[in-house]
């Protein structure tokens, strides 16, 4: 029995991935591994089993496909690839194990090297010490020289300061002379821009002359429809003709278009004159429309007389129709009045005999069933593990302690610092005192 246990532990992992293909295919290989691998499986089970199982997987599929003909040949190829991929990752883990053994020996050597590096720098500092001995020898001689140099420089600066003060005033005036020379030329240029300002004004009027040339032609067409309307207002247009004659002369060229402008003004007055002429005729025709209004009232009167004549006949008909139906209901009511007594008799006779015996038995059953469940709620006792639910809790013979009202808790006085007096959200709440 002990040697049999290891092989089954190795088989299940192999059975899980390829059970979807063909469970019976993997049964024969299960018989071969137990006798051959039991002893070596224990020490290196993780290294050898994955390497040995791929070959048996490749052989069985090659033997079984021929009997199944084509369908099995199509399914195994895609399923054969995953099993080939699984063993490869199992082979890689052992490859990573040896490199883990190498890093530990790598760490000690670097720790040995740093101490070797620190020793040489400690030897170099003493090399820098001799040059520190030389500078002190260099410093004393310069200390001897500076005192000799300080005296002459104090004598020279006063001689040097006056000349520089004389030069700056000489330099400032020339730049001041140049700006005035530059400003006049720009002043000469502005007058050059003035003449062009005189030219644009004459440019603007010509465009003003062109629009009037465009507007008159459309105005010439309406006067074609106005000839018959020019006759009635001969008195009013003459005064209106004079103002338009005054406006064109300032434009110099408009006088050429004066004739069309004379026609345009009469266009507006006649239009204003048209409404007055149009309004009177309708007022004159209003009497023509009035007669129809006079006819309308007499037309309404007769209909008012007719409706009463028309309403009367319909009112006469309904009463003639309603009485016959009303006559029938009274004939029907007496018959039902006689039937109720017949309906009342059966309920009085049958139900009283049937109901009393039916209600008696149920009333006897509830009292026997209900009392036990109703005993539990009134007690309101918590169930305990020591006593069954149908037993009462053992009585407590100790006398209950007298109830004493607890004293009211009075918080100690709060000493507010000066910073608490002005709070943005108002004063702090105060507990009530009793």
Curated annotation (Swiss-Prot):
Biased composition (Pro residues): 25-43, 51-77, 95-108, 192-205, 256-269, 320-339, 358-372
Bias type Basic residues, positions: 389-402
Entry superkingdom: Eukaryota
Repeat is among the record's keywords: yes
Any one Gene Ontology BP term: nodulation
Renumbered residue ranges of the record's region Disordered: 1-434
Entry keywords, A to Z: Nodulation, Repeat
36 X 8 AA approximate repeats of P-P-P-H-E-K-P-P: annotated span: 6-407
Compositional bias per record (Basic and acidic residues), positions renumbered to this chain: 7-24, 78-94, 109-132, 141-191, 239-255, 282-293, 302-319, 340-357
Record keyword rRNA-binding present: no
Function: Involved in early stages of root nodule development.
Family in the record: Belongs to the nodulin 75 family.
Protein name per Swiss-Prot or TrEMBL: Early nodulin-75
Organism of derivation: Lupinus luteus (European yellow lupine)
């Amino acid at each position: 029995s002990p040697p049999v246990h290891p092989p089954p532990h190795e088989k299940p992992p192999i059975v899980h991935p390829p059970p979807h293909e063909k469970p019976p295919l993997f049964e024969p290989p299960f018989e071969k591994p137990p006798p051959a691998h039991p002893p070596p499986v224990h020490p290196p089970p993780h290294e050898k089993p994955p390497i040995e199982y791929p070959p048996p997987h490749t052989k069985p599929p090659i033997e079984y496909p021929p009997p199944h003909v084509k369908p099995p040949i199509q399914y195994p190829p895609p399923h054969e690839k995953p099993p080939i991929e699984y063993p490869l990752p199992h082979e890689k883990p052992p490859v990573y194990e040896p490199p883990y053994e190498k890093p530990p020996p790598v760490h000690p050597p670097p720790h040995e090297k740093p101490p070797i590096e620190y020793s040489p720098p400690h030897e170099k500092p003493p090399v820098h010490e001799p040059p520190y001995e030389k500078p002190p020898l260099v410093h004393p001689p310069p200390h001897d020289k500076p005192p000799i140099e300080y005296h002459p420089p104090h004598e020279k600066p006063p001689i040097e300061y006056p000349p520089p003060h004389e030069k700056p005033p000489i330099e400032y005036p020339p730049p001041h002379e140049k700006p005035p020379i530059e400003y006049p030329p720009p002043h000469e240029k502005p007058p050059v821009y003035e003449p062009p300002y005189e030219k644009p004004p004459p440019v603007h009027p010509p465009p003003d002359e062109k629009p009037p040339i465009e507007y008159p032609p459309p105005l010439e067409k309406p006067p074609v429809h106005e000839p018959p309307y020019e006759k009635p207002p001969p008195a009013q247009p003459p005064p209106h003709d004079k103002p338009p004659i005054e406006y064109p002369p300032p434009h110099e060229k408009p006088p050429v278009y004066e004739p069309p402008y004379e026609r345009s003004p009469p266009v507006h007055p006649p239009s204003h004159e048209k409404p007055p002429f149009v309004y009177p005729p309708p007022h004159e025709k209003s009497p023509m429309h009035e007669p129809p209004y006079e006819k309308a009232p007499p037309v309404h009167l007769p209909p008012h007389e007719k409706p009463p004549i028309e309403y009367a006949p319909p009112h006469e008909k309904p009463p003639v129709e309603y009485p016959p139906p009303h006559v029938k209901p009274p004939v029907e009511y007496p018959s039902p009045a006689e039937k109720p007594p017949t309906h009342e008799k059966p309920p009085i006779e049958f139900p009283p005999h049937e109901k009393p015996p039916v209600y008696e038995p149920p009333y006897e059953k509830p009292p026997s069933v209900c009392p036990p469940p109703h005993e539990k709620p009134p007690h309101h006792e918590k169930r305990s593990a020591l006593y069954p639910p149908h037993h009462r809790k053992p009585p407590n013979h100790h006398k209950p302690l007298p109830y004493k009202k607890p004293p009211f808790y009075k918080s100690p006085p709060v000493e507010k610092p000066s910073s608490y007096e002005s709070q943005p959200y108002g004063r702090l709440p105060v507990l009530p005192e009793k």
